[in-house]
């Protein structure tokens, strides 16, 4: 599962207006008066909030603000401080789970003087941490592992899986990794879901937050078999995002998830069985249906993953692995799906879908969704060809004729009005000599 830059951008749009105001405030003049800011403090408590405090002295001011910036936001958000005095305090509420652990928050107070000018205090940075546990840490080349249950041998095995997963994905996709990735291992389901937030689906066992470069996984120290799949799977999402990220367009989810499954476990027998059964029962979803969020029902959810890796497997069997590096590089330029697939494979996404369906024995498909409505009944007294219909033909024809004449007359009036306005504008637009 992925928490992507696109997902965070939706929250960024929600604070666009306040962020714009914040930017304007940053660019504003500084008053002749000034204040002295004390040392800022920030205290983070998981599931409750982050409390920012700072003393201020000197000139009087009209109001005070908190300027906050979160990873992935399009700009800072500005929040008015209620009843500001010599000590400024603001609590960033995290009780609703809107941010995940390991999110780095930048903040600073600013005061607004009576003349509208502003003065900002020093910036403070704090990491929102899951402080419910005593975390232990192991540092690798790319991955920093955090865990609280299990011995050092368990942690080393999980770290090795992460390092190998990063290296394998980077080689396959042609991506050079340099920035570190934090990997948090949770031992029980409830704690894991609490960390990810209330929107987490019940069948998720791992999540990669590509904005904060953080991997969360539910791994019991006694279940390293599952870890061998989920760890490289989620880390592939990070590598894929590093290679394709751009300000304009995200690749389809089936491609992202399909690559993560393929590089972590291949196109396994269980996924093959799901796709085969769906093909026989004519319940396969086209790839166009898997570009965004996957279905929520369990059977369609797992089928979506199976179809995704099936499509990736089909492309690799037909075209080889090399075009995927071209695909990733093209996506990084902001190309559309059709542009990226055409550059890499020589075919657009419709052709990819058609070829994949044919590879699964499907040459025709039934279209669902909005359909053209059938023609309704002819009203009494009307005809479909302008002829008579019983004894009411004259009445129907005359009624239709009057309606048409009225419409034409109204159209003529509108055209005359437009012409008059256009003439007036043209006349007024004449240059003055």
Language model feature labels by segment:
Residues 15-25:
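Bacterial N-terminal signal peptides
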Residues 392-410:
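Juxtamembrane/start-of-transmembrane alpha-helix segments at the extracytoplasmic/lumenal side
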Residues 202-214, 219, 225-230, 242-395:
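Acidic/His/Gly-enriched intrinsically disordered linker/tail segments
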Residues 134-252, 269, 294, 298, ...:
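Juxtacatalytic substrate-recognition/specificity segment
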Residues 1-9:
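N-terminal secretory signal peptides that target proteins for export/translocation
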Residues 28-30, 106, 383-390, 417:
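Soluble, non-membrane globular domain cores that form compact, hydrophobic packing
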Residues 405-433:
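C-terminal membrane-anchoring or membrane-association module
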Residues 22, 30-134, 431:
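Glycan-association/targeting regions that enable binding to alpha-glucans and other polysaccharides
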């Amino acid at each position: 599962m992925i928490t992507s830059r696109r997902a965070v951008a939706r929250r960024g749009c929600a604070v666009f207006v306040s962020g714009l105001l914040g930017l304007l405030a940053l660019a504003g003049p500084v008053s002749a008066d000034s204040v002295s800011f004390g040392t800022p403090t920030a205290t983070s408590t998981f599931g409750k909030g982050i409390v920012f405090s700072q003393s201020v002295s000197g000139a009087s001011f009209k109001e005070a603000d908190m300027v906050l910036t979160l990873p992935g936001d399009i700009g800072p958000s500005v929040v008015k401080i209620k009843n500001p005095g010599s000590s400024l305090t603001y609590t960033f509420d995290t009780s609703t789970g809107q941010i995940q652990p390991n999110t780095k928050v930048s903040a600073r107070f600013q005061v607004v003087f009576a003349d509208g000018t502003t003065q900002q205090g020093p910036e403070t940075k704090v990491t929102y941490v899951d402080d419910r546990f005593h975390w232990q840490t192991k540092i690798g080349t790319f991955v920093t592992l955090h865990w609280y249950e299990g011995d050092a041998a368990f942690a080393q095995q999980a770290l090795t899986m992460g390092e190998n997963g990063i290296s394998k994905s980077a080689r396959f996709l042609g991506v050079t990794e340099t920035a570190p990735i934090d990997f948090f291992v949770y031992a029980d389901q409830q704690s894991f879901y609490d960390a990810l937030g209330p929107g987490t689906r019940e069948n998720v066992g791992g999540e990669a937050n590509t904005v904060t470069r953080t991997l969360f996984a539910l791994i019991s120290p006694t279940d390293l078999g599952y870890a061998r799949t989920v760890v490289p799977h989620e880390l592939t999402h990070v590598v894929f995002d590093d290679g394709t990220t751009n300000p304009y367009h995200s690749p389809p989810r089936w491609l992202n998830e399909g690559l993560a499954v393929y590089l972590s476990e291949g196109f396994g027998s269980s996924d093959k069985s799901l796709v085969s059964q769906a093909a026989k029962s004519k319940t396969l979803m086209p790839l166009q249906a898997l570009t965004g969020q996957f279905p929520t029902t369990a059977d369609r959810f797992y089928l979506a993953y199976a179809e995704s890796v099936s499509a990736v497997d089909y492309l690799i069997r037909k075209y080889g692995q090399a075009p995927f590096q071209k695909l990733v590089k093209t996506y990084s330029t902001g190309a559309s799906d059709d542009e990226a697939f055409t550059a890499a494979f020589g075919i657009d996404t419709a052709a990819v879908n058609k070829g994949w369906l044919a590879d699964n024995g499907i040459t025709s498909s039934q279209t669902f969704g909005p359909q053209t409505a059938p023609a309704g009944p002819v009203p009494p007294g009307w005809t479909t060809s302008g002829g008579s219909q019983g004894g009411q033909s004259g009445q129907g024809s005359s009624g239709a004729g009057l309606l048409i004449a009225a419409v034409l007359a109204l159209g003529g009036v509108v055209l005359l009005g437009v012409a008059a306005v256009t003439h007036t504008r043209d006349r007024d637009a004449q240059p003055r000599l």
